[in-house]
């Protein structure tokens, strides 16, 4: 099922003609994923970009401001990664776990925004949040995260 995020899968099933009560009863969870290129561990370097640099790389303003004090890594390039700065892939995930509230929203044919709000209140993380944790761990770059999520 192709959607932009996990909450969209609930509304997409309705759009495809799946009876809403079946969505609420049969779906236990939805996992959205993106694959980001993994920074080469042999040549990446830590740096602290300015907020302007983050905004220029298409990272939303609220994410840029929330990242204050966070460590960032960037690609350099070496023989081990063929001068690309990347080697391998890392998953960026969003897991929506079905609960009674979300099941009721599915039956009511609620909007994607309402489903997302309920899922976030139940503990779902956004793709951005998971991606930023991968950036902070030095697994990928903020530029790569913006590339796969925007």
Spans of features found by a protein language model:
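Short, flexible helix-loop junctions that flank or precede catalytic/ligand sites
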Residues: 1-150
